[in-house]
Design a protein with these regions (language model features):
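Exposed acidic/Ser/Thr-rich ligand/metal-binding surfaces
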Residues: 274, 484-487, 495, 499, ...
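Acidic, polar low-complexity linker/tail segments
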Residues: 404-470, 477-482
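C-terminal "exit" segments of structured domains
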Residues: 401-404, 414-421, 611, 621-682
Length: 682
């Protein structure tokens, strides 16, 4: 009887004991000791990882493996820690070890493929690749009409799009799932056959009305403000305006179909000039359609002549970008990146290279009834296509993206108030481009494959309107003569933060030093002479970049480094490889921008980091100043989402590893990730 009771008690104990890690060493007491030590180090490693202490977590996972060599779960986590620390080669090595042990399945294999691909291919997203349909927004819901004859669209920073519905005289806003979230009909008497919509530099919208012979101005939310223009052939008059564009000075350009010309208005709506009539070297427009302004160059398509023509801001003809007859019936023409135009032609979408006029076919909708009247790039790297005749709105994605799906990563799990759990999840495509605008319906969180309770989407970092900034100052000898410019640049950057977020100043001397950390308002009287770090012939810039990034890992979800330099530093990257530094910044969503205090070119190393981390290079005396640098950082898309749910797991007093999974869906694309965490010790 005593023996039976003993066996029963032993069974109960074993059923509830911690069995997260299995010892591969010899049996007996050594097995129990090794498992216990490994589990404790593993728990510490997971907690360090979620605190953003990646180097510390690497050491703790290595200790766990010293007790349990080859444990796949620990190998997976060690790979994650190396990845976030920017050491992607070591991360891939650990993940491959885990994969060879039969761990992770397709999920781990996909992660290895994506990270490997990112390391060996260019970060450039590629403007000449093929796109194919990944989804569409229906024009009816049961017996209810949603839109009719979509004619143009405009992307928004939150992932949504505006669509002009020509047939219903409306401007509609769709979220990423194709749900209408806002519907506008213009002035009191309504739109009169709206044709195109653009966003002006002040944030307002401009809508051309082809039957109303006018241009309406709306707020950023679509509320009507005013309109200008009138029917006629005189200055500032229109007959059937079609497509719109705006230049750097706020002037608005409209292709005037009825008068076969382009009409230019100032920012207030006053007519300035018109052009496109027959002149020397140019025989005049026959049917001007799409228009795009790129710097000081104006490009106009003609649907009858089938070419693209270039003018200056005064309306002088400069030449032919794409020869007559190249296109069958070109319509919309929009700038795409800095080097291409996006053009629609019947059932096709083309990319046109600005430097050469080379034409690349990007997408085709088929051979049926089709007339594509606009194609624009959205916030997620798709092309939104409006098909006037087919009455469809298509979402076109790169073919490689449809095959590979999303790259989804758990970045942090906060379980301090267990059973309430908060998780932060990042969603990207295979080329590291964030996926923004997702809603709660696009996610499914499970624990042990069972849906969690009280699941709520708390927010999306992409909607944040401020950022934390690290200002990195070059202390090379050449910077001595730029102290006045440096002081002014720091003050201007800090002032443009409007007292929001935190700013730190790191000086890149022989040894990097954190000179300041606090509210940007405290830098209103900053002077370069107050910096403690001495000038040096060889500043340790790589260590300074690493130090700057370390301070931003746990900062606001939007964050960036701004490097101030005269541009001629050499031999400054000796401790860390450029690829590892760039990976560290990218894997923690930290951008790197450069402000040059002289007209010298930045070093190749700095250019590489700036180019590959969503950064931008600025000259201190550029006409618009440095006031928009912070805004540019805030405007960088972020695919980070935060959720809250209630866990149903037992924690074994905080010693049990609790699994959690997430799946993300959008139209015909999906992605998933798995992780785990520990509740607080009791």
């Amino acid at each position: 009887m005593k023996k039976i009771i003993f066996v029963f008690i032993a069974f109960i104990f074993s059923a509830f004991a911690q069995t997260n890690l299995q010892d591969t060493a010899s049996t007996g007491n050594s097995r129990s000791a090794n498992s216990g030590f490994a589990e404790e180090e593993f728990r510490r490693g997971v907690q360090s990882y979620y605190r953003g202490s990646f180097n510390e977590s690497i050491l703790e996972f290595e200790k766990a493996l010293s007790y349990l060599p080859g444990e796949p779960l620990v190998l997976d986590w060690l790979g994650k820690a190396y990845y976030r620390a920017g050491i992607e080669g070591a991360a891939l090595q650990q993940w491959n070890y885990a994969k060879e042990a039969g761990y992770g399945g397709l999920l781990l294999q996909n992660r290895i493929e994506i990270v490997s691909d990112r390391r060996v291919t260019d970060y450039d997203y590629g403007f000449t690749q093929r796109f194919t349909e990944s989804g569409s927004y229906p024009n009816v819901n049961g017996n209810n009409l949603i839109y009719s004859q979509p004619v143009s669209s405009l992307s928004n920073h939150d992932g949504s799009i505006w669509v002009v519905s020509y047939g219903t005289n409306e401007l509609l806003q769709f979220d990423v799932n194709g749900t209408v979230v806002r519907r506008n009909r213009g002035p009191i008497n309504g739109f009169d056959r709206p044709m195109d919509v653009i966003r002006l530099k002040n944030g307002n919208l401009a809508v051309s009305e082809s039957a109303g012979d006018r241009i309406s101005i709306l707020s950023e939310n679509g509320s009507f403000i005013k309109y200008f223009g009138a029917r006629g052939r005189g200055q500032g008059q229109l007959v059937g305006p079609q497509y719109l564009a705006e230049d750097d000075f706020g002037n608005i350009y409209a292709t005037d179909f009825g008068n076969a010309r382009v009409v230019v208005f100032d920012a207030e709506g006053n007519g300035l000039l018109h052009f496109g009539e027959k002149t020397e070297g140019f025989d005049g427009f026959k049917s001007p359609t799409g228009i795009a302004v790129c710097g000081g160059r104006i490009f106009v398509a003609d649907s009858v002549k089938g070419g693209i023509y270039e003018f200056d801001k005064a309306g002088n003809f400069l030449g032919v970008l794409v020869n007559d007859g190249t296109f069958s019936r070109p319509e919309s023409l929009k700038q795409w990146g800095s080097d291409y135009l996006l053009l629609t032609d019947r059932n096709k979408v083309y990319a046109v290279e600005l430097s050469s006029g080379a034409v690349f076919e990007n997408a085709i909708t088929g051979k049926g009834k089709s007339l594509i009247t606009s194609a624009v790039s959205d916030r997620n790297g798709n092309i939104i296509v409006t098909d006037f005749k087919a009455n469809e709105i298509y979402v076109m994605s790169k073919m490689t993206e449809l095959v590979g799906g999303f790259f989804v990563q758990f970045e942090r799990v906060i379980s301090d108030n267990f059973p309430e759990v908060i998780v932060e999840v990042r969603v990207e495509n295979r080329k590291r481009q964030p996926v923004v605008g997702l809603k709660q319906q696009n996610f499914l969180i499970t624990e042990g494959k069972k849906p969690v309770e009280d699941f709520v989407l708390l927010g999306e970092a992409n909607n944040n309107d401020f950022a934390d900034i690290a200002i990195l100052i070059d202390r090379s000898l050449s910077m001595k003569k730029y102290e006045e410019q440096l002081s002014g640049a720091v003050r201007e950057l800090a002032a443009s933060m409007d007292g929001k977020g935190q700013v730190s100043i790191i000086s890149a001397g022989k040894v990097p030093v954190t000179e300041f950390s606090g509210n940007p308002s405290q830098l209103s009287d900053f002077s370069a002479k107050a910096l403690k770090n001495s000038y040096t012939e060889n500043p340790a810039l790589d260590l300074a970049v690493r130090l700057s990034a370390n301070g931003l890992v746990n900062a606001e979800k939007k964050r960036g480094i701004i490097y101030l330099s005269a541009g001629d530093s050499e031999n400054t990257f000796t401790q860390y490889a450029l690829s590892d530094l760039t990976a560290y910044l990218n894997n923690n969503a930290i951008s790197f921008s450069t402000v040059l205090l002289s007209q010298a070119s930045p070093s190749e190393e700095i250019s590489y980091i700036t180019r590959n981390t969503n950064g931008t290079s600025y000259y201190i005396y550029r006409p618009e100043g440095l006031g928009t640098v912070i805004k540019d950082i805030v405007d960088i898309p972020s695919g980070l989402y935060q959720f809250r749910y209630t866990s149903s797991f037992a924690t074994e007093y905080g010693r049990k590893y609790l699994p959690v999974e997430i799946e993300t869906y959008l139209l015909n694309r999906s992605g998933r990730d798995e992780t785990g965490y520990f509740a607080p010790l009791q």
